[in-house]
Amino acid sequence: MARIRQELQSNRRMVRYLAGVLVASAAFAAGPVYEISGRILPRARASVVLFGASAPYSASTFVFPGSEFRFKKLQPGAYVLTIFIRGRGEARQPVEVGPATAGRHGRIFLTLRLKDSDFVLAAALDQHTVSAKQLAISPAARRDYREALKDLSKHNVDSAVRRLDDAVERAPQFSAAWNNLGTIAYQTGKYDRAEECFREALKQEPRSFEALVNLGGVLVTEQKLDEALDYNGQAVLARPNDALAQSQLGLTYYLIGSLDLATKHLEQAIEIDPLHFSHPQLVLFRIHLRQGNPNAAAGVLEDFLTRHPDWPWASNMRSTIVELRSR
């Protein structure tokens, strides 16, 4: 019984740590701001959205063939670029913003050479196709939603939340607004509220992959592992090439003690997106330690630091690698 209690306490610490991973990049020194710009190849008209993975943020722009996108006044942290091109679908690109990645002038320039395999077509078209239920959303609620996104682009989170609350009060079926409320709640540590919002988003739009995978994520954080296994499993079935879905399912299996299945899904997440903001390498590191494989654990950490040079605890990780290699 003591061993079980110890394992449960270890799992709770692990989940709290991994939830903190999403905001860990806020540990960078406050003050410097950064800029992301780039171009898309092959040239195409595209909608480009930048989401904050570690803190509430959203900004969007539209690019014409050959033109560049640009996002300014960014705080350090993890971001996700979403590119939607009509006829091809949706592609995502993680971006880590910090001193090492941005260089001396605080600017990151990306050349996105997008292949067909980078795009999710059917699911993206579903997402960008408005259902009859969503068409019934009032113009006032849509205006609240647009203004909330503008607030997020200016880092005005409180105002964004108020506007999103107004939007769902006017239009309770507004799934995207519920999902944004849940994302902000999760990123600010209000997990009960996040779960409530993600459940409502999924109820109002059962096809919403974002609501599905986000609900799976908060259920892991809350240690509701039976439900987490269900929802994250559904997310992987819906989009097997989604790194977040694979990473969260791997973490869920880790927490229930199914290490082989955890390893399978975490390795798939890393293969899909080795830079993913959920950092599946850190859970895989723990698995290798539990299985008594210090060299594999050290290798995972080395790979992680290569991809995340601005990680706040890089120095401690390097010391851990040296210790593991000496065993």
Kindly give the residue locations of the regions a language model identified.
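Structured interaction patches on ligand/partner-binding surfaces of diverse proteins
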Residues: 30, 61, 86-111
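Structural signature of tandem alpha-helical TPR/SEL1-like repeats
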Residues: 153-163, 187-200, 221-234, 256-268, ...
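Helix-start (N-cap) detector for alpha-helical repeat units in TPR-like alpha-solenoids
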Residues: 141, 175-176, 209-210, 243-244, ...
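Structural marker of alpha-solenoid helical repeat scaffolds
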Residues: 170, 204, 238, 272-273, ...
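Alpha-helical segment of the N-proximal tetratricopeptide repeat
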Residues: 133-176, 180-183, 187
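Short, acidic Ser/Thr/Gly-rich low-complexity loop/linker segments typical of extracellular
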Residues: 54-68
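Canonical tetratricopeptide repeat
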Residues: 180, 214, 248, 283, ...
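A short, solvent-exposed beta-strand micro-motif common in secreted/extracellular proteins
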Residues: 77-87
